[in-house]
Amino acid sequence: MNAVSGILMLVAFLPYVRAIVNHQTVPSPVTWAIWASVDTLALLAMKKEKALNGQIIGAVTGAWIIAVLALVFGKPTMGSIEWVSIAGAMVGIVLWQRTGNAVLAIICSQIATFAGAIPTFVGGYQNPAQEDPVAWTIWFISCIFALFAIKKWNLANALQPLTFTVINTVMVVLVVIRPHLL
């Protein structure tokens, strides 16, 4: 389940990359750089806690690819949510360094990840066509596999897959289900 989740996470980036290159999706370089950074923080903290999973590995790899593509094809924005995400990541790093507690870094990174998703929620609500429904559906399926792959239900192991599941569930409702109801 763990490997399947990671593979699906990576595969989901393919239609998203295609949508970016075909100018169907306009990613924010700032948002994707933040997501890539906080996902990297989560990966490092989860590795320290021996809680690493395939989904976060796929997420970090894909997020950095999208961050680079966003520099070429994206539209830079820097709003309050981006600043909250940066602050959350910085707090996580400082807490981890000061206390040696990687779980605090995981918690802060997931708060920052969720805060960073809010502009995407708003965009998905206002204009669902700007997001790739195939990518979001595959990411959601990856989340289901990641949840089943959790071996130990504690913050170190479960918070990241749960956060990703909430984000992807909201996006599937907004860009896959809701447009069919309108």
Kindly give the residue locations of the regions a language model identified.
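Alpha-helical membrane-protein topology signature
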Residues: 1-182
